[in-house]
Amino acid sequence: IRIGETGGIRVDEYLETSAKDIYAVGDAIEFPHPITGKPWLNYLANPANRQGRIVADNMVFGNTTRYEGAIGTSIAKVFDMTVASTGLPAKRLRQLGIEYAASTTHSASHAGYYPDALPLTIKLTFDPRTGHLYGAQSVGYDGVDKRIDQIALLIKRGGTVRDLAEVEHCYAPPVSSAKDPIAIAGYTANNI
């Protein structure tokens, strides 16, 4: 079984190793990062679970289901706050020599005139020429998860900062704002 440059087991798009009919998943595999195309290891449970399902399908039905890769979406609670990230942060983009622009916005978790609206910060990294999203980080007390999940989906689908402003959100003052924090982040990044 071939080992890749990162020390992980090299797999193809069906998660098959260099040995026919032998598959690998989870922390052990090396797979190209969807944004950079460079091999990387991803130590997160969500991609590993998806990989398990893909391998089960491929073992039963033949190599019919492809793995798209993972961009590293993660979240943690730090006391009362939530911090989350997806894709490539500025530090990693610098290390890789990838030109990027960044924007940081400060919004509220829901409509500011409704009680208990709490601060929510979003930082975006993106291609300064095309606006394609590279990554996002967010910190706040409420609603961080749904914002990062939406941005992660856009990144995986090749979305741009303009697409952030076009995402249709459900709106009611207790749970969101008429201009959602990711729309504000998109408008701001689009102005750079």
Predicted features along the sequence, with ranges:
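FAD-site-proximal beta/loop scaffold in flavoenzymes
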Residues: 1-57, 150, 154
